[in-house]
């Protein structure tokens, strides 16, 4: 692709190949044309006809009307279309009559008309001039084809502007366009006429031979430029002598000659783009050639550029943009402006006055025309047509690619600063979308292990500072629009509906519960009540039964009662009280006042709750002062307490869920509460800090913030593929300052000049890459130059419309853990990156002074020549090749999302592949390894659509089958590592729920859905990173840690004056220094062993997870690795009584249950994949004689209802224990004793058949019961609301209906 004088040409050549010969018209055909009825004329065509108004402003003329050069009084620019039609129809009929008087039609019908003469006759007649002088020349002699020779045999004067002199016929050029009254040449959308609507725009000089032609040239030597069509000129050879001056609507420098040259050039480009061998054309070379008075070597002249570019058009060159059939004034003006822009001059073909050189490779067929001469040689074009791509409404993204060239950084920056766009108008859509990141924790506490309330964490120190408030407000504005109260209410109430009463394991919220909503307001969009109200009434909140009534109370209530929720209300009690009262409504930012209000609202909400019911209270600021009052005043008011946090924006507000309203509860402060609050406040701080990167709303981007846009604009840029131009330097520096994957190009037409804007996001990582660059890589511009489409204007949209997918969130979270937490404090200098990827993102992530060696099987897309070769190396190869490890010394290694694919490709399972890989690198003296491994670290459950765990084959199936990789258990992986590195310290890294990784999401200009956060954290637990540290002594865990079991951990330390710190999921859970040992994961005692120089920690863990341990030695953190705290064995054994000892009455049976005491157990049924509690009168886990037993009652529905004994952990049912009660399901019922019968599982009914006949329907029971059937006072049905009947002995068949 070439740019000639600012006009982009494709690398294809194409021309028409078949010429249409001159078709002479018969006399009768002319008469017919002249007498055509109004509206069906063959003499003209309206180019802009409006079918609604029947109007037009411009007409295209056809022979012989196109020979008319109107006298001033007959120019039709004051006529409408209808007036024109009427006038021309009348005049042409009159002309036909006059002609037939001189030459009767019958006698002359078949004679061929001289096309020049009939044109002159038409022009004179319409101008009301005599036509007698032309009539003798009307017809051509038989078999004569030359229309010129008969007219120029002798000198003659036909009129004052048409005459023959020295065998040359001079006559005004006819108008090819007629403009009517509504034509406005100053409007950009008007069709361009190239001046051919102006009378006397040019004089046509027809000549019969070369001698006569020379006469013309000599006559006008030194005058205006003379132009000529070389290829099959209309009716015969002629020279055009353009008039001087500029037509109205055009720039003053555009005279008639230049306009005619432009018309011919555009016509030629249009023909080249559409021509094919199946279509004949009147003229293949549509261009005009300047044959006298030109300046072919002065490339500053527009006419010279037009003439030289025309030479390329003759060869078959095509523009990259399509030429309209009838270009507008704007189109032509833009073309001429681009033509005068920068670009290479036309030097491929020499200009000759009387000839045109034709390339050997050109498809142009010149036949016997002596004006065209074949020129041998090679040219950078190929034969073919160009496919034109339509314009786009939006800018185009492009991926930067680079040449093997660089430019000086300072020079590139200088060029860039001349074209940079300052003060960009940033458009900031939403950084946060989706619903909420919801967390809930049981903080009921153990009276035997009370956490001191006064040591609970307070709010972040600068929470109320102007800067923190500004950042929280900014994030709130960048949250997608939704009714935030509704989102919170749905999460909170959905969770509350699943909570079980700790006394009987029954769901508290059953069908028909009553509810009070405190803080209800009428400020929810189009509705005058909280949106959750209607959703609850209609039953559309998942899992929540429909309440019998909902009462609303608050300051701004519309469908309830106005009430102050801090004062005792004159109301009854409710099963469920939900308070969304904001304490800041009255207290503002006064912590003391808000604490007082929160305690008061809690007191009122609990007082309105029925015994055994639920209470949810919002607390804006959960400070130690609030917790002190809560546990002092309400410790006995419920049997369990949960803390809920639906994260929607950055706030520290929480919701407290009081379970089973009571007067004898025992709520105490718990370690779980402290952990939750630490995590809550850490998350708030992280989300606040990340907003430091984001520019404020309502202001332009001045480049002050690390996140924003960089843009430069080039006008008709010269972007060669080989040379270095200032524009190339500008683009190179632009790409060096932004994230490559965010690059966009916008091409706009600015009155003919093409404005090309390059823009993309800058981030703190792009700045890191720029600092690492020694020179600036030169971009490859082939793809950019190929873009001929115009686009919409640049849109500086800071955050994308679609949130980052889970896998991208995970990568960004990994980046945070590695590049901001682990690596900087280790001060490592030489890195080897396995499977880095061709985009070389690591160069942006690592500090500029760090040496990086990258290995990947694919070639790099990054230009490594622009970086210091001593510190940045890229190896195309296989990192499983032993030769790579001998040649590349390093002290640190990473393999992120690389090993699984490599082992899968080699057909190895993970343990075998990992062992081989570690032995492979062992001789390289590596000190640190970060390996992403597929292992079920935090869960064994699949993630639908993301990771399917195939336990049979030991494979992870990613993204629905797109990729399959091996996985292994964590213990097997650690055993393989110890086999190669017995003294290695190993630490597992997963994404933290403190969301400290959002700096690499929002801070990099990505948006995220809060719905995906939980999924991403689970994903990271299935694909964690293992840090292998060969420089530190690992902690020793002689016996694996298990929840509830006391164990010892040995932690080496250089001296006693150190502190051991333990963390889980990014939250510190204990510190131990020999004096104090506060711990939220269970009782902890610590002793210093001076002989072995280690700390001996005795701990009884109270929660499962990955425990990370470090030693703080004078501010230097010494890694001691990770260890897993497992849940107790989830084995359960139930011993049922012998068949002979079964009791089929409602007295029930007892089966001994053996299971670890850690697990709280209950009996459930599975309904549509979800566990639901069983009526405790039917089956329940009870404690008798300090042992747990399953107490159950036999029922004829047992053969159709499979019950399960499940654990209830953190309000999750069946996560660890889900034992089907097959013994009960397979019961054989006797036929000689009364039996109990109830409906089966929910939403189904039962029917008893006896001897093949209906005995009784169980739901509903009939009004009249069969003999011997008795309704039981106490229901033992699966659902307690349904009835149980006792039936007499018999051989019943139970049917589910």
From Swiss-Prot:
InterPro entries: Reovirus_L2 (IPR010311), Reovirus_L2_4th (IPR048604), Reovirus_L2_7th (IPR048602), Reovirus_L2_8th (IPR048294), Reovirus_L2_GTase (IPR048601), Reovirus_L2_MT1 (IPR048598), Reovirus_L2_MT2 (IPR048597), Reovirus_L2_N (IPR048596). Pfam families: Reovirus_L2_4th (PF21062), Reovirus_L2_7th (PF21061), Reovirus_L2_8th (PF06016), Reovirus_L2_GTase (PF21063), Reovirus_L2_MT1 (PF21065), Reovirus_L2_MT2 (PF21066), Reovirus_L2_N (PF21064). Its EC number is 2.7.7.50, 2.1.1.56. It catalyses: a 5'-end diphospho-ribonucleoside in mRNA + GTP + H(+) = a 5'-end (5'-triphosphoguanosine)-ribonucleoside in mRNA + diphosphate; a 5'-end (5'-triphosphoguanosine)-ribonucleoside in mRNA + S-adenosyl-L-methionine = a 5'-end (N(7)-methyl 5'-triphosphoguanosine)-ribonucleoside in mRNA + S-adenosyl-L-homocysteine. It is an enzyme of class 2 (transferase). Keywords: ATP-binding, Capsid protein, GTP-binding, Methyltransferase, mRNA capping, mRNA processing, Multifunctional enzyme, Nucleotide-binding, Outer capsid protein, S-adenosyl-L-methionine, Transferase, Virion. GO terms for molecular function: ATP binding; GTP binding; mRNA 5'-cap (guanine-N7-)-methyltransferase activity; mRNA guanylyltransferase activity. It is found in: Virion. Signal peptide: none annotated. GO terms for cellular component: viral outer capsid. Its main location: virion. Belongs to the aquareoviridae outer capsid VP1 protein family. Outer capsid protein involved in mRNA capping. Catalyzes the last 3 enzymatic activities for formation of the 5' cap structure on the viral plus-strand transcripts, namely the RNA guanylyltransferase, RNA-7N- and RNA-2'O-methyltransferase activities. This is Outer capsid protein VP1. It comes from Aquareovirus A (isolate Chum salmon/Japan/CSRV/1981). The gene is S1.
